[in-house]
Amino acid sequence: MSSAAPAKKPYRKAPPEHRELRLEIPVSRLEQEESLTDAERMKLLQQENEELRKRLASATRRTEALERELEIGQDCLELELGQSREELDKFKDKFRRLQNSYTASQRTNQELEDKLHALASLSHSWIFAIKKAEMDRKTLDWEIVELTNKLLDARNTINKLEELNERYRLDCNLAVQLLKCNKSHFRNHKLADLPCELQDMVRKHLRSGQEVASPSPSPSSSLSPGAVVPTSVIARVLEKPESLLLNSAQSGSAGRPLAEDVFVHVDMSGGDPASPPAPGSPNGECCSVSTAGGSPEEELPLPAFDKLSPYPTPSPPHPLYPGRKVIEFSEDKIRIPRNSPLPNCTYATRQAISLSLVEDGSERAHRSSVPSSPASAQGSPHHQPSPAPSALSAPASSASSEEDLLASWQRAFVDRTPPPAAVVQRTAFGRDSLPELQLHFSPGHSTAPPPSPHRERGLVLPAEPDSGFPQDEEEEMLNLPVSPEEERQSLLPDKEGTEEASGPSHVDGRAWPLPSPSRPQRSPKRMGVHHLHRKDSLTQAQEQGTVLS
């Protein structure tokens, strides 16, 4: 009994499922068991064994259930493990493929990077080339703009120069026409200073006058180079027999074309082709063109030059007639018409129109007052004799001629219409003044002693050409006109002499024949030798390039 007491306090408390359910026997029961018998004790132990067996069976059942659950869980875990292994294999395959694709993409990226680097270098070069091309294009645009501006400036300059050239050409043509009609009052010309053709013309006129006066030629009629030719003689030689009209119906024989626009020289070889050639010419004197042993073409008389047209045929300039440098006009008889059709023309054109109107009016008035003479009708071999106009048709013809003159100048210089062929082939100088000049320059007039300064129409030879007298003393010895008034008085006869219709008039003891109606009295302004300057000055101006500057 004493051994059962220490069992109440075990060393370690077991878990609740393993604990034994010991019923505490009360003290009263223990006291009762002590008093029980063995039989009763056996029954009590058997009951306890059965209870233990029941408990063992329930524990076994529980253990089996746990084993079954463990087996079921193990199978599930094995299935899950297989599935996870399969998934792992799949993931490994995917990883392998991804690694291969990554390697391939890496190689591709490297190649693309190389290509991009190459393209970048090319793009840099292209960008540089594009920038350079743009700069070149901008430079070319600037150059094009500058060249365009220069071209426009050059075109404007060319247009202005063409206009100036056209105006200068027309002015020069008009100046040539006016200079051949205007007279110089400022100097007397020596024979050696005149052009060759003008020397021949002066000789032929003087020779023809001497032949009319005395048929036998005198040996003293030869001219020396130092002989002073009065301006009146040159004016008579160069005087035009017809008015300066571009629309006139009269036209001469077809002659040679004009030498140049700037200056038109005159044909001086209209005399006798069979005349003997002049001997060796001295210093400054020109020889005749035709010779005895020349060709038949050279021996034929050259026709007179055509009248200057507004648009002459250009040809190489004549060596004896270079261009002029300065052209001046006198304004004594210059007037501008009220109803002028040329308000925008040049000064020279207006002068020519006004001068032509003035001289045309004086010409018609003189023709109506002076009857016709047979000498004037036979003077010009190039023009047919026209019948004398009646006094009734004078006013109508004057008005129509003035209108025709203005219309002709408008057609020539405003509309720029080319002149007709008849006007182009018109001769510049007729020969109807030969009989009058023959009477004026007869040997009696040329050798008679001059009683007054008005008698300078004959050619006066100096006594000593090689003497050392100055030019002024020589001109005083030759009794030449000193002032333009004296020369004008010598050229224009007095009114008393012109009013007499029959017979010559006497002025200062000299007989002046009445001019013919076909060649009326001209103003000194219409007779000019402005273009007859010294050859040295003309040559110097031509060499220096200052001609018509």
Swiss-Prot record:
Residues 369-383, 538-549 have a biased composition (Polar residues). The modification Phosphoserine is found at S295, S315, S340, S483, S537. InterPro entries: Tjap1/BEGAIN, Tjap1_dom. Residues 42-171 form a coiled coil. GO terms for cellular component: bicellular tight junction; cytoplasm; endosome; plasma membrane; trans-Golgi network. One of its GO terms (biological process) is Golgi organization. It comes from the Eukaryota. Residues 522-534 have a biased composition (Basic residues). Keywords: Cell junction, Cell membrane, Coiled coil, Golgi apparatus, Membrane, Phosphoprotein, Tight junction. Residues 1-34, 207-226, 266-322, 359-404, 410-429, 434-549 are annotated as: Disordered. The modification Phosphothreonine is found at T313, T417. The keyword Membrane applies. It is a peripheral membrane protein. Its main location: Golgi. Residues 14-23, 485-498 have a biased composition (Basic and acidic residues). The keyword Phosphoprotein applies. Residues 311-320 have a biased composition (Pro residues). Widely expressed including in adult thymus, heart, lung, liver, small intestine, kidney, spleen, testis and skeletal muscle and in embryonic brain but not detected in adult brain (at protein level). Residues 389-400 have a biased composition (Low complexity). It is found in: Golgi apparatus, trans-Golgi network; Cell junction, Tight junction; Cell membrane. Signal peptide: none annotated. Plays a role in regulating the structure of the Golgi apparatus. Interacts with DLG1. Interacts with ARF6 (GTP-bound form). This is Tight junction-associated protein 1. It comes from Mus musculus (Mouse). The lineage of its organism: Eukaryota, Metazoa, Chordata, Craniata, Vertebrata.
